[in-house]
Amino acid sequence: CGGSIVIENEVIAEVLAEETVPSQPCGEIIDAKGYYLMPGVIDDHVHFRDPGLTHKADIHTESTAAAAGGVTSFMDMPNTTPQTTTLEALNAKFADAATKSIVNYSFYFGATNTNADVLPTLDKSRVCGVKLFMGASTGNMLVDRMEVLRKVFANAGMLIAAHCEEQSIISANTTAFKEK
């Protein structure tokens, strides 16, 4: 099957059946006969480690690698240094990505025992979700108080990506495995 795609200002403007003529004259035609056109991948769980661990990689290097692999959008986790658990840290990440990323991006906001009241203020058109650790976590991102968990689930108003581990079960199973 064949067809054409018209791109204007880096945006797909038209998708046309085989013999359909574009509505406007085209400046450049690329013959892609024999090739496949596929949509870009959205990676909804990345750890770019920026800010804080940029000796490993940063938003620019990781987004460049992502683009080379067909990833057009990423959603970065909040366990960076500093953690993305305040509006200030979140806004700083968005500002940094605006100058570094070569693909589309969004960021998770990390829930803590002390920031559940901030969740309703998050911009749902920019923030992809709330990351919730209910088991062992890095930094202060463990949410282990029932009243806070209720607030997180009631107030988030968006996707909640949760680690629902029970640390006592993990510890018991680890001990049992080591004894075998």
Descriptions of predicted regions:
Residues I5, E10, G34, H45, ...:
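Divalent metal-coordination and catalytic microenvironments
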Residues E19, L53-A57, M141, N173:
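Alpha-helical transmembrane segments and their juxtamembrane interfaces
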Residues K33-K100:
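Metal-associated gating/positioning segment near the N- to mid-region
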